[in-house]
Amino acid sequence: MSRSSEDYLQVLHLGDPAHTATLLARAANETGRDWRVLPLAKSPQAANAVARTVGRAWRGAWWEAHFWGAKLARPRIHLHSAMALPHVGWALGDYALHLHGTDIRTRRYEPAYTNRIYDAVTHARQVFYSTPDLREHLTDWRPEARLIPVPVDLDCPAAINPYHAQARSTGSYVFFVSRWEAVKGGNTQVEAAKCLRARLDQSVALVGLQWGDSQLLDAAQEAGVCLIPKLPGAQYRQVIRDAAACVGQTAGILSASELEALAEDVPLIAPLNPSWYDTSHPSLVDVPVWGGTALDPLDSETIAKLTLAALQTPVSKRPPTRDWVQRFHSPTAALTGVLEGYRAAGW
């Protein structure tokens, strides 16, 4: 990767949604830079209000001390949450902002948070966003904001598959990669599971995470989905790696979970919103999923049919997907985009 005279040798990342900051820092450090990630402080869990208040004050003071020390060594700050502005604004200085979802998609429209989000977005030297659906929420405030496609770890180690351990089976299965919530298209996923269970041989299991809305979780189980606990990264990735096919969320975008399936060359059935997956960025064109922009996100029947087709297609005839992830969603690709954004902003 080309290097300029200064070239952002030291950058401090605040927050780490979807491990984006960790993957960016790892890629940067492999080039000889010295980037660091400082997770944002979390509110302590305690049984009573007094303990929570004391714990919050102590943790806040501890975190701010670490933040200040880290900033002295790395004055350039890449902030991964607009909501965090009141807690870090006192020391930010000139910063880059990276938006990952809820803050710009939802919070900006809530009166209690609109001003906070506006200040964070408009005062940043450069603004990045992680998924194409966020663009429409940013264009009025920062039309020049840059898409940095979600990076995916391409070197995730092998791990124990907890589904195989729980089910005491090494048989074939279809994995629903997303949590069971309406915002992820949970109702359509349940209906697709029903269609699949009615058509699949009983030797092929349906597997999903015990994560999401309780009513949808119950419905998924009734549809024949074996639910396994929410998993740490390597185990979750192993469940994806061992799947015969994966069904993604039906919200019209690819999040980290869907991209991890593509990184493992596992067939992914997912609808993509054509308003978002356009020609505005190379990563949004010819996405190698089953369905894509031609698939109606409410069409559970077609989702099931595509899943069956993927299962019946020999591996040698499936489109390779890992190479596409390497090209557009690798940590190196994300780092290249971020550095270009820094330079374009004169940061």
Language-model features and meaning:
Residues 294-302, 311-343:
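A charged, aromatic-enriched C-terminal amphipathic alpha-helix characteristic of glycosyltransferases
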Residues 76-78, 90-107, 127-128:
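Active-site proximal beta-strand in glycosyltransferases
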Residues 241-253, 266-267:
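Acidic donor-binding loop of glycosyltransferase active sites
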Residues 215-234, 242-245:
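Nucleotide-activated donor-binding/catalytic signature segment of Leloir-type glycosyltransferases, i.e.
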Residues 159-184, 190-197, 207:
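Conserved donor-binding/catalytic core segment of Leloir-type glycosyltransferases
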